[in-house]
Amino acid sequence: QAEAHKGAQKAVDKLMARIDEMIAEMPDYLTGEEKMAIARNNLEMEKALKIKKGKPMDVDKADKQNANPKHVEEYILDSKGIYRDKRGNRYRKNSDYDKKRDTPYSINCQTCAPAYALRLRGWDITAKGNVAGSKLEYLSNGRAFEVWKNTDGTPAQHISINSWLAHKGYLKMTPKRYMEYFNEVCKEEGVYELCIGWKSGGGHATILQRFADGELRYIEPQSDNSAGSGMEWKDVKYLCEIGAATSHNCRGVLRIDNKLFDVSFLDIFDT
């Protein structure tokens, strides 16, 4: 019996050491309660995924399309290309693009955004493609935030664009109001998931990140817009310009770096 007790104590000590190790890796701006809850969530994810969480990744390793490596652009930048966007950038058709194969990886933003956030924590996971009948298709119908929980396990609630408009006494969004909204709801250092509707119709789930120096950056995990990608003009100002004037209640912002991931949605990732 004493031996069994000793073995059990050893297992508990090992578990606590693992939790302490994970907590030590986390950003200082998270609270003690948040760190402990995330560490326990990591253990739950390790058990479900049957892989070990690695060391936290920096922004470059988590981003630069590493969260969605199977994404292929239909058009690629080419100064002599015959296609142009509204900004005058020239493109040519990508000969490597295959519509049937590649479309699922251009409509999977609802997994790219959490994949980026979890990669920052040290999870070497990537986004699956969005195909009919998948959990990803379920999330893409206005349910993107359902993958996140508060530290007490309750469903996380986003700050909807509509509730912010009502609070401000505004009737609709404008580019200036989008900037005001982003700066108000993404005030603290951290990682935020944004669900936004486009002026042209449709919508998108993506990332806004507030850094220690005060910068608010639009990070696009689905298709690279980082410095040097040629697409860095897709910035926060760009989001403000193409955001819809009116939105469904599912549109808004949720801080996610201090949230728990619902393990029932882990099959939206490849490992």
Per-segment meaning from a language model:
Residues Q1, P114, D213:
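Residue-level marker of positions within ordered structural domains that often coincide
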